[in-house]
């Protein structure tokens, strides 16, 4: 590289202050070559710290150009800037900016974690750096157990972890006693002698006197830039930079390392606030316990009821043409007619009967065309099927007799044809070009397996036969067995009557077994209802997780700034807080499942008719649900953390 290592050209930095902007740097041009040791001197408020932040890619110019090794920083994305900070810059802060819950060696390792270095290599280099700086016996100590000078040396070691081509020292002696300050300056000079570019930001002329180049700044402008002939060259300490940098691990290993670091930091954060963590998990625990227990109770109740009702008959029977399901001759059999339905309806064991015939036809209303199942039925159809109308009325015997052009539609058809119109009664629709007046809308019936999406229209069977289908025979007959009558006996009598009328067995019957279906549907609906109530507690728990994570982001803003300064990407920060949220939810989910098994034991003490039945699917779903809650409700806090400005984050206490 032939040009300067760092070059600013007419750089200006403004900050908004009310309706006006405050100019902190004004038209600054500056170049620094590799291997220089430079002091930037100025009073408080002169703009020297802002200049250092721009040099270290923690901040960006409002206008002008800044290049690092010939690369224009304004063209770089946030992750590319993080890579520059991680691989080229090392920061030494006046306030040290060490993470209090990590030991000295772990603080030094941090830049290498985000560089993707292998764990063993980064620990070896961290210990070597601390040893060269006289802290080998303090590697396992936390910052609170170190003196100010020792903390600053840890900060220097951290700056060198990834090589530290450029060392940026912001008032490195400002918080130290004179002896510790001299030691820090000595180390910086030794690093410069080893080839590191050292930039010292200070207001102390005595500190600046150790630099071979002094740049003076005042009111955001450079007012002096001179060489210092009185600065002595330092002798390089042979191993002051700690030896070889740790090699970057393979992509997979690097990703695993960063994830492990995120999990470890999440665990430390959770353990350090035990009560808050427990209260955060409480909503998740209650929700998971409720969902798993309710599903287990519902499954146990269903099995018990199915065992109990066993062979109980049902009250609805269908009659179809043919020998059985799939009979290829069924379409050719035309002996099932409306008179059969009338004869069945007259039997003492039958409550009601309805003929049925159906086709898929095109419906049209104004400019809306849809395909629907059009069924021709008798006036007792809705009674037989137990269907209720949400609007209007059903057609009666008179409409059936005179082939009236009237129709009853279901709710799905109403939505498709009429959209936002809540009252389609009296509207005329075309059924295969036959105009029919809508006289009723059936109420929605939800299946235990979900909402039925098909479209249904019912017209008098005489209208269907004479005006739409052009056929006299029926597709089926549905009868409802009178209450109190044995379903199997009714089926036998029905079969006998039909044989007498047809003279041969050209039909078959199907007993709907409605009791079993009703029990299953009721059990599933009840389980669903109670599960939804439990899910509400899960959502509340998730909101609690989000609130606590937002608080955690606020509390750890400075930590986020430190991590960004040493090279953490936005994705690294987001991953850390997402892992923390998911960890909370998974722990809550695990505790909830354990409590569910405990509830099973208590349940068996009070209810002996059936027992709770757990399934692997419900337990796996609980863990999946916990993970999803952690991701969904942890996303916003994690995103907020990743979008923090490094300078603003570092400035917060």
UniProtKB/Swiss-Prot annotation:
<dbReference type="InterPro" id="IPR003593">
    <property type="entry name" value="AAA+_ATPase"/>
</dbReference>
<feature type="transmembrane region" description="Helical">
    <location>
        <begin position="587"/>
        <end position="607"/>
    </location>
</feature>
<dbReference type="Pfam" id="PF12704">
    <property type="entry name" value="MacB_PCD"/>
</dbReference>
<dbReference type="InterPro" id="IPR017871">
    <property type="entry name" value="ABC_transporter-like_CS"/>
</dbReference>
<keyword id="KW-1003">Cell membrane</keyword>
<comment type="similarity">
    <text>Belongs to the ABC transporter superfamily. Macrolide exporter (TC 3.A.1.122) family.</text>
</comment>
<keyword id="KW-0997">Cell inner membrane</keyword>
<dbReference type="InterPro" id="IPR027417">
    <property type="entry name" value="P-loop_NTPase"/>
</dbReference>
<keyword id="KW-0813">Transport</keyword>
<keyword id="KW-1278">Translocase</keyword>
<dbReference type="Pfam" id="PF00005">
    <property type="entry name" value="ABC_tran"/>
</dbReference>
<keyword id="KW-0547">Nucleotide-binding</keyword>
<keyword id="KW-0067">ATP-binding</keyword>
<dbReference type="Pfam" id="PF02687">
    <property type="entry name" value="FtsX"/>
</dbReference>
<dbReference type="InterPro" id="IPR003838">
    <property type="entry name" value="ABC3_permease_C"/>
</dbReference>
<dbReference type="GO" id="GO:0005524">
    <property type="term" value="F:ATP binding"/>
</dbReference>
<feature type="domain" description="ABC transporter">
    <location>
        <begin position="6"/>
        <end position="244"/>
    </location>
</feature>
<dbReference type="InterPro" id="IPR025857">
    <property type="entry name" value="MacB_PCD"/>
</dbReference>
<feature type="transmembrane region" description="Helical">
    <location>
        <begin position="616"/>
        <end position="636"/>
    </location>
</feature>
<comment type="function">
    <text>Non-canonical ABC transporter that contains transmembrane domains (TMD), which form a pore in the inner membrane, and an ATP-binding domain (NBD), which is responsible for energy generation. Confers resistance against macrolides.</text>
</comment>
<dbReference type="GO" id="GO:0046677">
    <property type="term" value="P:response to antibiotic"/>
</dbReference>
<feature type="binding site">
    <location>
        <begin position="42"/>
        <end position="49"/>
    </location>
    <ligand>
        <name>ATP</name>
    </ligand>
</feature>
<feature type="transmembrane region" description="Helical">
    <location>
        <begin position="278"/>
        <end position="298"/>
    </location>
</feature>
<comment type="subunit">
    <text>Homodimer.</text>
</comment>
<dbReference type="InterPro" id="IPR003439">
    <property type="entry name" value="ABC_transporter-like_ATP-bd"/>
</dbReference>
<dbReference type="GO" id="GO:0005886">
    <property type="term" value="C:plasma membrane"/>
</dbReference>
<feature type="transmembrane region" description="Helical">
    <location>
        <begin position="526"/>
        <end position="546"/>
    </location>
</feature>
<keyword id="KW-0046">Antibiotic resistance</keyword>
<keyword id="KW-0812">Transmembrane</keyword>
<protein>
    <recommendedName>
        <fullName>Macrolide export ATP-binding/permease protein MacB</fullName>
        <ecNumber>7.6.2.-</ecNumber>
    </recommendedName>
</protein>
<dbReference type="InterPro" id="IPR050250">
    <property type="entry name" value="Macrolide_Exporter_MacB"/>
</dbReference>
<dbReference type="GO" id="GO:0016887">
    <property type="term" value="F:ATP hydrolysis activity"/>
</dbReference>
<keyword id="KW-1133">Transmembrane helix</keyword>
<keyword id="KW-0472">Membrane</keyword>
<dbReference type="InterPro" id="IPR017911">
    <property type="entry name" value="MacB-like_ATP-bd"/>
</dbReference>
<dbReference type="GO" id="GO:0022857">
    <property type="term" value="F:transmembrane transporter activity"/>
</dbReference>
């Amino acid at each position: 590289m032939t040009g300067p290592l760092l070059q600013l050209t007419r750089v200006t930095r403004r900050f908004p202050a009310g309706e006006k902007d405050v100019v902190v740097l004004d038209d600054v041009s500056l170049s620094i070559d590799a291997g220089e040791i430079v002091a930037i001197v100025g009073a408080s408020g002169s703009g020297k710290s802002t200049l250092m932040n721009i040099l270290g890619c923690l901040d960006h110019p409002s206008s002008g150009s800044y290049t690092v090794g010939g690369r224009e920083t304004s063209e770089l994305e946030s992750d590319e800037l993080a890579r520059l900070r991680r691989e080229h810059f090392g920061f030494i802060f006046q306030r040290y900016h060490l993470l209090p819950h990590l030991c000295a060696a772990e603080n030094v390792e941090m830049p290498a974690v985000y560089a993707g270095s292998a764990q063993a290599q980064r620990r070896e280099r961290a210990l070597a750096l601390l040893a060269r700086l006289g802290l080998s016996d303090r590697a396992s100590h936390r910052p609170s157990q170190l003196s100010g000078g020792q903390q600053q040396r840890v900060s220097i070691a951290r700056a060198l972890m990834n090589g530290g081509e450029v060392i940026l020292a912001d008032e490195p002696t400002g918080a130290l006693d004179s002896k510790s300050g001299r030691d820090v300056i000595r180390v910086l000079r030794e690093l410069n002698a080893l080839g590191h570019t050292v930039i010292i930001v200070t207001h102390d002329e005595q500190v600046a006197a150790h630099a071979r180049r002094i740049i003076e700044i005042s009111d955001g402008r450079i007012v002096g830039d001179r060489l210092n002939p009185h600065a002595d060259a330092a002798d390089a300490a042979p191993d002051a930079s700690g030896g070889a940098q740790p090699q970057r691990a393979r992509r997979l290993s690097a990703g695993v390392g960063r994830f492990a670091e995120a999990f470890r930091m999440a665990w430390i954060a959770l353990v350090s606030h035990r009560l808050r963590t427990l209260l955060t998990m409480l909503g998740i625990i209650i929700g998971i316990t409720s969902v798993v227990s309710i599903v287990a109770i519902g499954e146990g109740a269903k099995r018990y009821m199915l065992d109990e009702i066993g062979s109980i008959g049902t009250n609805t029977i269908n009659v179809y043409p043919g020998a059985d399901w799939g009979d290829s001759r069924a379409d050719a059999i035309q002996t099932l007619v409306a008179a059969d339905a009338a004869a069945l309806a007259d039997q003492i064991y039958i409550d009601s009967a309805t003929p049925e015939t159906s086709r898929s036809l095109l419906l049209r209303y104004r400019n809306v065309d849809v395909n629907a199942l059009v069924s021709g039925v008798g006036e007792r159809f809705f009674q037989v099927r137990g269907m209720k109308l949400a609007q209007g009325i059903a057609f009666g015997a008179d409409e059936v007799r005179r082939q009236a052009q009237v129709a009853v539609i279901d709710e799905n058809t109403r939505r498709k044809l009429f959209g936002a119109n809540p009252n389609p009664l009296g509207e005329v629709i075309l059924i295969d070009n036959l105009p029919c007046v809508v006289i009723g809308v059936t109420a929605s019936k939800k299946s235990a397996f979900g909402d039925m999406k098909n479209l249904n229209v019912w017209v008098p069977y005489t209208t269907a036969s004479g005006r739409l289908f052009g056929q006299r025979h029926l597709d089926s007959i549905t009868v409802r067995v009178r209450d109190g009558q044995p379903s199997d006996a009714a089926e036998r009598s029905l079969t006998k009557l039909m044989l007498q009328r047809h003279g041969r067995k050209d039909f078959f019957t199907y007993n709907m077994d409605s009791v079993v279906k009703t029990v299953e549907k009721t059990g599933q609906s009840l389980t669903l209802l109670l599960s939804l109530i439990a899910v509400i507690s899960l959502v509340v728990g998730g909101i609690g997780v989000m609130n606590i994570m937002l608080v955690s982001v606020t509390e750890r803003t400075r930590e986020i700034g430190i991590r960004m300064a040493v090279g953490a990407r936005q994705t690294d920060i987001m991953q850390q807080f997402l892992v923390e949220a998911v960890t909370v939810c998974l722990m809550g989910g695990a505790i909830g499942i354990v409590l569910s098994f405990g509830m099973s034991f208590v349940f068996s003490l009070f209810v002996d008719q059936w027992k709770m039945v757990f399934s692997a699917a419900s337990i796996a779903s609980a863990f999946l649900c916990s993970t999803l809650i952690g991701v969904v409700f942890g996303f916003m806090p994690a995103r907020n953390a990743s979008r923090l400005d490094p300078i603003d984050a570092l400035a917060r206490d």
